[in-house]
């Protein structure tokens, strides 16, 4: 019996109050068409599980139909910069949305435990896939966490780019799938590997953002950015396995610079699962699905966490909304828990990954007293006993975590101890640090060869400003 239905009929299968597990990853293969159809059907009061998929939560929050969500990261990086989902943030502030932000690996392990007990974490898994057949078999080029979401749910409702007669080796077999609808471009404006890329204008319309036109950076600003990237690259060791997480376009570029200069034998695993991806320009985000087509191999997100847990990852880059002198990182909120001034994107997988790796590299492009603080407002991740080395790279110095806290190993040219102290919110010991070695001609030439168009400078720009968002009541049509 055929399981193929219309998109509208598929959406009607999701009743108000349902718990939904949403597939895709960041701005890749999100079931956008299905989400819009659900919203247009005036169903609401949903509970959502996402690992992590902030644009999906943004659509549901903007429509006022999301009651609670489990999502470890509600930000994403794209052509306009880094954005924290604004409707999600607003719904949390007004009390309309109860958001829980566990470590992504905790979510994965919870899904596994529920699956292994034969139970379900969600009523439905909502997916968009590359291929389906009429019996319900699904094929996904880039599964991410989708297989696990399907296995831990009551059933799968899927949209597909194409229907074929038969899929002999399905990613998700028909017995897990309830219904399928044809929806070409059904993941747009997010990407669908093998079919189309991300549409920045469409993303912008969904979140209410616009590109802010800024003057070109001055020579001193471009020099500072190049030096920051070079100093990051110098922390990457040869013959190591190194990983980047979400919103890590800057570290990804630094890793490629290291590969072409001082660390030719490194193994780099991107968070989308691309092993040794070919980096031939400055990408606007580290979550680039197309990298999976230009790499040595792939690994899915649950297996990447397992690899780190089992000691297979040496080094990882981390960001920090705040970091204190003892190495505690805050990615959660600024201000008290009861009334935060700013809600940050969330932990992603940083707590678990930090507890498994030997070398922790922390990138803070602009050192200020408000981000290098005496005490973090929330402890998202902390130093672990397995961390043999923790290095913090800023635009002022290169810091090393010692037994008594961070100490500057070197200060950049033109930075005095007084300058450094004025930009640091914690006390530190300063034992006559060296001056950071200037960039070499080889490093500069190699960086320019990777990114001749200067896309790297856009990675350091401010966030987009709000404009009118795409109205959730607008009819969005999909070919199907």
Where are these regions (language model features)?
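Conserved alpha/beta enzyme-core scaffold
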Residues: 1-423, 428-432, 437-480
């Amino acid at each position: 019996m055929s399981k193929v239905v219309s998109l509208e009929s598929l959406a009607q299968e999701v009743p108000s109050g349902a718990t939904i597990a949403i597939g895709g990853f960041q701005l890749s293969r999100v079931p956008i068409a299905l989400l819009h159809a659900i919203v247009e059907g005036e169903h609401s009061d949903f509970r959502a599980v996402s690992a992590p998929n902030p644009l999906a939560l943004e659509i549901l929050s903007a429509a006022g139909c999301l009651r609670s969500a489990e999502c470890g990261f509600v930000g994403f990086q794209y052509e306009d910069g880094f954005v924290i989902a604004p409707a999600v943030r607003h719904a949390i502030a007004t009390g309309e949305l109860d958001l829980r932000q566990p470590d992504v690996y905790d979510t994965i392990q919870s899904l596994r435990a529920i699956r292994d007990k034969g139970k379900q974490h969600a009523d439905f898994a909502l997916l968009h896939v590359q291929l389906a057949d009429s019996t319900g078999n699904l094929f996904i080029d880039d599964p991410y966490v989708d297989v696990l979401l399907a296995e831990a749910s009551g059933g799968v409702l899927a949209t597909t780019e194409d229907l074929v007669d038969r899929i002999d080796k399905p990613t998700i077999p028909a017995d897990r799938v309830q219904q399928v609808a044809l929806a070409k471009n059904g993941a747009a404006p997010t990407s669908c590997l093998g079919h189309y890329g991300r549409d920045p204008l469409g993303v912008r319309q969904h979140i209410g953002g616009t590109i802010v036109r800024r003057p070109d950076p001055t020579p001193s600003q471009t020099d500072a950015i190049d030096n920051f990237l070079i100093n990051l690259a110098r922390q990457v060791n040869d013959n190591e396995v190194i990983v980047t997480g979400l919103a890590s376009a800057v570290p990804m570029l630094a890793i490629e610079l290291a590969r072409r200069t001082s660390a030719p034998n490194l193994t780099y695993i991107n968070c989308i699962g691309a092993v040794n991806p070919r980096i031939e320009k400055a990408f606007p985000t580290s979550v680039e699905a197309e990298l999976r087509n230009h790499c040595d191999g792939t690994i899915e997100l649950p297996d990447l966490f397992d690899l780190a847990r089992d000691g297979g990852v040496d080094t990882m880059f981390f960001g920090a909304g705040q970091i204190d002198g003892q190495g505690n990182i805050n990615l959660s909120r600024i201000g008290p828990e009861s009334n935060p001034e700013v809600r940050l994107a969330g932990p992603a997988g940083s707590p678990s990954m930090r507890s498994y790796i030997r070398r922790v590299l922390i990138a803070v492009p602009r050192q200020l007293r408000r981000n290098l603080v005496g005490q973090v407002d929330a402890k998202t991740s902390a130093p672990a006993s397995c961390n043999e080395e923790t290095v913090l790279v800023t635009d002022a110095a290169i810091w090393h975590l010692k037994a008594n806290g961070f100490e500057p190993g070197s200060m950049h040219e033109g930075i005095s101890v007084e300058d450094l102290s004025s930009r640091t919110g914690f006390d530190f010991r300063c034992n006559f640090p060296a001056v950071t070695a200037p960039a070499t001609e080889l490093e500069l030439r190699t960086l320019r060869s990777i990114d001749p168009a200067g896309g790297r400078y856009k990675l350091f720009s401010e966030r987009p400003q709000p404009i009118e968002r795409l109205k959730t009541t607008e009819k969005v049509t999909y070919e199907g």
